[in-house]
Structure formats: structure tokens, C-alpha cells
Regions:
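Alpha-helical transmembrane segments of multi-pass small-molecule/ion transporters
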Residues: 2-345
């Protein structure tokens, strides 16, 4: 009887590990395929360099802010949750930012490359891969925790991204705190998050006054928001493919290898390892959300943002592509190790 139970437990564990690998492949393959389509469109001159640049600007100033607004607004209920994992995530992202800031200063003298590398170190593809990943790892509980966490990590990612791209300016211009703060306030992505938070707060006030009202009640308006949201990611990926140059791989090999190792190896070890050692109260659902923060690839939105704010957009694009490929393994091994430690048992 005990042997049978042990065999069943091993089989169940193997099934989960297999599912993790399949999920990792299924999560990243649509991203890579869309990038390839963008690359093909460039080769047949349907997506020219000028058009790609114009679309990137449109994505950055319209589609991504609407997507972030919608992601925040869709959080159904904060309910009763432990703020510990939220505090941990935000502090860990800040520490990663600080450590990587020191690293890029010593690693390269090119301010544009510094900005792209620094942004790529901490900025996870949370909305596109992270939340579905949390659901795959720990079901409805995982996605509930990850959704709540998104209200805090997405603003954190974007604030630090603006700082990353503001402090390194070509020509050795010293960072101006006032300009950086103004850049944060004026940044379309930050404005999208802020608008989503305000709408969420208004909705909560309505609920407390027994007035049930949601944007979804205004069907035409919400349908437009949904359409614009759905355009953000595929357009970003198509443009990424159109701007991707294989010739740049050799030129940027040192930066690509360093960026991918940081994002796909060191950060998962740091973020998940410290949480496992010191945060004993975290359960499987919290760790599912943390995997989404620390083990996923670099956010696609980092490319249009790098282009619009004068960083090395070519390097940013290369980092997104190669970190996405590497994330197949980082996601798999993160879930495998956590499962073997009994976190996802």
C-alpha cells in the first residue's frame, strides 16, 4: 500500500515537472513565432524600418498604457491577502536594480547600452507570461495572488525603467532628479497604471456605497479598451522582429550573454532563493507569483520604451529575444527545484 502511494506521488511529481516544461515551451513559442513573422515581413518589405519605428511610438504612447490600465482595472478583489510577499517583491526588485546599476557602470562605458542592460535586468514579462505562469504552477490560487501582486510590481517595474533610461544619457549629462521625477510623471506607461489604479479605487468606492458599477457595464467603451489592449503585445513583437538583426548578435555578444545570464540565471536564484530561505510563511501560491516576477523573460515593452527614451533599442530587442529563448529553461528549472523542495507539492 505504501509503495503504491509512493509510486503515485512520484508519478504525480513527474507529471507536474513535465507540465512545467510543456508550459514553458507553450508560453514562449508564440512570442518567438510572432517575432519571426515580423522578421519575415521586414524581408518582404511589408514592414519597413520607418513604419516599425512609427508603430513602436504608437505602441508606447497608446496601446501599452491602455493595456496597463486594463490589467490593473481587471483585478477583481484584493480580498484578504498577506502583504508580506508584496513587500518582499518590491524590495527585491529595488535591490536587483541597485546591484545591476553598479554592474552596468563597470561593465560598459556606453550610456545607451548601460540603460538597455539595466532596464532588462529587473523588468519581467509579467503581464504576458507571468500571470498565466502562476496559474499553471498553482491554479486559481496562484493567479489570484499574481493578479494582486501585479498592482504593485507593474508600477515598480515601470518607475525603475524610467529611472534606468533617464540616468544614463549620451554625452555624460548628469542625471537631474527633477527631470527624472518629471519623466516618471509624464511617462505614458506610468500614466496608464495610475489611471487604472484611480479607476479601481472609484470602483471600490461604488461597491462600498452599494452601487455596482464597472467599466464593463459600458460595453462599447470597454470593448474599445479591450481591442486596444489586445493590439499592444502582437504589434510590439512584430516590430521587434522587423528590427531584429542577426548581424548585431556578434557585435553585442558580450552584452547579450551578460544580460541573459543576469535575467535568466542570477535573478531567479537571488529572488527565489532568498524567499525560500528567509520567508517561511510563503506558500505555493506566493511562490508561483514570485516565479512570475523573477524567472520570466525581459518585458517586450522594454524595446519601444528604450527607443522612445534614447537608449540602445537594438540591444534591448536582442535581450528580449534571447532571454525569451532562455526562459524556457529558467521557468522549467525554477518550477522543478521548487517542486523538489516541496513548495509545489
Amino acid at each position: 500500500m505504501k509503495k503504491t502511494q509512493k509510486k503515485d506521488k512520484v508519478k504525480k511529481g513527474n507529471d507536474k515537472m513535465g507540465n512545467s516544461f510543456i508550459f514553458a515551451i507553450n508560453a514562449v513559442s508564440p512570442i518567438l513565432l510572432t517575432v519571426i513573422i515580423g522578421y519575415i515581413l521586414k524581408k518582404v518589405t511589408l514592414l519597413t524600418a520607418d513604419l516599425a519605428k512609427a508603430i513602436n511610438k504608437l505602441v508606447f504612447r497608446v496601446f501599452l498604457p491602455v493595456m496597463l490600465f486594463n490589467n490593473i482595472y481587471k483585478i477583481s478583489d484584493f480580498g484578504s491577502f498577506d502583504p508580506g510577499y508584496i513587500i518582499y517583491s518590491v524590495i527585491a526588485i529595488a535591490v536587483i536594480f541597485a546591484l545591476c546599476l553598479v554592474f552596468v557602470i563597470f561593465f560598459t562605458k556606453d550610456p545607451k547600452k548601460r540603460a538597455a542592460l539595466l532596464q532588462g535586468s529587473f523588468r519581467a514579462n509579467y503581464a504576458l507570461i507571468g500571470i498565466p505562469l502562476a496559474e499553471a504552477l498553482f491554479g486559481a490560487e496562484g493567479v489570484a495572488v499574481a493578479s494582486i501582486l501585479s498592482a504593485f510590481t507593474i508600477p515598480t517595474f515601470n518607475i525603475f525603467a524610467v529611472i534606468s533610461l533617464s540616468i544614463f544619457r549620451e554625452g555624460g549629462e548628469k542625471p537631474d532628479v527633477k527631470k527624472i521625477l518629471l519623466g516618471i510623471v509624464k511617462n505614458p506607461l506610468i500614466q496608464g497604471v495610475a489611471a487604472g489604479a484611480v479607476a479601481l479605487l472609484i470602483r471600490a468606492i461604488f461597491v462600498n456605497t452599494v452601487i455596482e458599477f464597472r467599466l464593463t457595464d459600458i460595453e462599447p467603451a470597454y470593448k474599445v479598451i479591450t481591442w486596444l489592449t489586445n493590439l499592444a503585445t502582437p504589434l510590439s513583437l512584430l516590430v521587434l522582429g522587423a528590427q531584429f538583426e542577426f548581424s548585431a548578435v556578434a557585435e553585442l555578444k558580450r552584452e547579450i550573454i551578460s544580460g541573459v545570464l543576469i535575467r535568466n540565471l542570477l535573478i531567479p536564484l537571488f529572488g527565489l532563493g532568498i524567499a525560500y530561505i528567509f520567508c517561511k510563511s510563503f506558500g505555493g501560491e506566493e511562490f508561483a507569483a514570485l516565479v512570475a516576477v523573477f524567472a520570466t523573460p525581459i518585458a517586450v515593452s522594454s524595446v519601444p520604451m528604450a527607443q522612445e527614451m534614447g537608449a540602445d533599442a537594438t540591444l534591448a530587442g536582442q535581450l528580449v529575444v534571447w532571454s525569451t529563448v532562455a526562459s524556457t529553461f529558467s521557468v522549467f528549472f525554477a518550477s522543478l527545484i521548487l517542486h523538489s523542495l516541496g513548495v509545489f507539492a
